[in-house]
């Protein structure tokens, strides 16, 4: 049985908490796409864990964690994360030999190109994700399994650098020496080599077990279905998770969509419900809305039903979790976007271009006292009405309501 968790907004929805909450029900937790640009924070027993590449299942001692073929792996970051744990998590970690590797030149390219874009900057995290995926598509990328034969890999990379010397010179990027390259690759092999395997076959061999596919980033950042070009470089929707793991669609049991009780976005790109006034500032401060990966303040605004319904439909969600409801405590009124207006015309669907979209809002009464509530009946009545309103508009059951950072601060309906 395979369940899947996917973000419904622009990322940072709190997927890690729900994965951590339900991971005890799963034998295998799989990360299927993205790279260390994805950051999620999980709080357990008061201790905060910031994960970028590792699946959230690492906090469950009984789960095997898989980094799938669709992930782009920066070995330095992965080694750093593994070492940050007091106990040995390697015994329960597998890395796909087909997952592509981010090398330092990918990061240098990413940062140099973003700088050259000037005012047209996309807002990339500068972690080398796009260039690594670009090399994958161009069929010149490096896969984790190639660490098994370092001399052959070095030969391949030397040829790559020779072919791209003009481009590197244009961007002002220094090509690493062979000795430095060899030293780094040997360290990667020493630290990670024993974990690299055919994870697709492993998953096929264990289809009788309970599995959880954990998406990174979120629907509105999908390379095809998101707010292009202000998107990530992979398919972040449910179908992308299947491609990034090798799991067949027929094996999928349930899709759980994750959304905040409001909306946030990091970096550039359209954001119809953004509030750059006092309300947005209050949400940011009460919600601690600063990027796990970059530390950048997130842009904040109101819940967007149109975007959420679009995401729920794209992913085929069976149920939804609404996160950080407690952040909206203390507002006299809360807004919900129920439609868009473009050139005076009202629409209720998510268009491919959002630049000229204006939100159409309804206002609901606010509430106080939702923090750390664990039972539906204990939530303030107006908070209940808020959840029920969103549930009706998106047409999918809201099963989980998060009321705090701790794992147990969750209402399960």
From Swiss-Prot:
GO terms for biological process: 'de novo' AMP biosynthetic process; IMP metabolic process. It is found in: Cytoplasm. It comes from the Bacteria. Binds 1 Mg(2+) ion per subunit. The keyword Transferase does not apply. GO terms for molecular function: adenylosuccinate synthase activity; GTP binding; magnesium ion binding. Substrate binds at residues 292-298. CDD domains: AdSS (cd03108). Mg(2+) binds at residues 12, 39. The active site is at 12 (proton acceptor), 40 (proton donor). The keyword Amino-acid biosynthesis does not apply. It holds the Pfam family Adenylsucc_synt. It catalyses: IMP + L-aspartate + GTP = N(6)-(1,2-dicarboxyethyl)-AMP + GDP + phosphate + 2 H(+). IMP binds at residues 12-15, 37-40, 125, 139, 217, 232, 296. Its cofactor is Mg(2+). GTP binds at residues 11-17, 39-41, 298, 324-326, 402-404. Its EC number is 6.3.4.4. Its main location: cytoplasm. Pathway: Purine metabolism; AMP biosynthesis via de novo pathway; AMP from IMP: step 1/2. GO terms for cellular component: cytoplasm. Keywords: Cytoplasm, GTP-binding, Ligase, Magnesium, Metal-binding, Nucleotide-binding, Purine biosynthesis. Homodimer. Belongs to the adenylosuccinate synthetase family. Plays an important role in the de novo pathway of purine nucleotide biosynthesis. Catalyzes the first committed step in the biosynthesis of AMP from IMP. This is Adenylosuccinate synthetase.
